[in-house]
Regions:
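Gram-negative outer-membrane beta-barrel domains
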Residues: 2-306
Length: 306
């Protein structure tokens, strides 16, 4: 009896093993491919420097009134022009927001996107120019005019709205080009000092000093273009180095210079001149930044367990 029971148990175990071997195997579900690393919204901060010739000023000065408010006729205008330029450098810092798309084409991974940024600028520029003009017939008296002009133009802020197109040279390293609209707050001022010298006639040797200045402020719109490198150094975080060139067009204004009463004439006798000026607002930006990528597509799914 005992032998019969043991034989039955062995037979059942053997049959169970055979049935289990015939059952289809259950494979683990295939791994889900990770969503594109760069796709999605991002925000960040940046800081760096700006430099260039965005303080170049060109001016033309002419006299509208002579002593005693006598109008200077067109045939007797004392006029002169000059120009100057200088470098302009300052610190720049601000933030950006953007969106990336990632696609594979021809065996390469491309990243396209759009970005908007705005930065404050701490810096200024100035230049000076000197010119002279002579006229042999001002109310019958030969006179000469020597002008010293100093101008400056600077940006208080600059922002851009740009497209970006890049290629991944490594899964975590992007090289890109960028370009689009730029805008900025331009502040300019011209200060002009003139020396009016009567070289002949009854008032020969009489000298006068004229001085004045004119401020200018506006929001200029232009373009910007450049490129950079961006490195995804950890999940959702990237660092970038970027260069941009910007051109916001011309800033223009008029300075009215009034007699201040020195030299051969006394009191405010109406001696006056006008300076028109223009200055090109352009320059370079070199900056570094850090971005946080929201990358919602890469959020791990929640799997219920029972």
């Amino acid at each position: 009896m005992k032998k019969l029971i043991l034989s039955s148990v062995a037979l059942v175990a053997l049959a169970g093993s055979s049935i289990a071997a015939d059952l289809p195997s259950q494979k683990a579900p295939p791994a889900v491919a990770p969503a594109p690393l760069w796709k999605g919204f991002y925000v960040g901060l940046n800081a760096g420097g700006t430099f260039g010739n965005n303080s170049a000023v060109n001016g033309t000065t002419w006299n509208t009134n002579g002593p005693s408010n006598a109008a200077v006729m067109a045939s007797a205008l004392l006029s002169g022009s000059g120009s100057g330029s200088s470098g302009n450098a300052g610190f720049i810092g601000g933030g950006q927001i953007g969106y990336n798309w990632q696609a594979r084409y021809g065996g390469y991974n491309f990243v396209t996107g759009a970005e908007a940024d705005i930065q404050g600028i701490a810096g200024s520029g100035s230049d000076a120019s000197r010119w002279s003009a002579t006229n042999t017939d001002y109310l019958g008296q030969p006179v000469s005019l020597l002008s010293n002009q100093k101008g400056n133009a600077n940006l208080s802020y600059i922002g851009t709205v740009r497209g970006r197109l890049g290629i991944l040279i490594m899964p975590t390293l992007l090289i890109y080009g960028t370009g689009g609209l730029a805008y900025g707050g331009v502040n300019a001022n011209v200060q002009n000092t003139q020396f009016w010298i009567t070289t002949g006639g009854a008032n020969a040797g009489s000298n006068s000093v004229i001085t004045g200045n004119s401020p200018y402020s506006s929001t200029q719109v232009g373009w910007a273009a450049g490129g950079g490198l961006e490195w995804m150094f950890m999940q959702n975080w990237s660092a970038k180095a970027e260069y941009l060139y910007y051109d916001l067009g011309n800033a223009a204004g008029t300075a009215v210079n009034s007699y201040i009463g020195t030299g051969g004439f006394s009191g405010n006798n109406g001696l006056q001149s006008v300076t028109n000026y223009t200055g090109r607002v352009s320059g370079n930006i070199v900056r570094a930044g850090v971005n946080y990528h929201f990358n919602f597509a890469n959020v791990a799914p929640v799997i219920a367990k029972f």
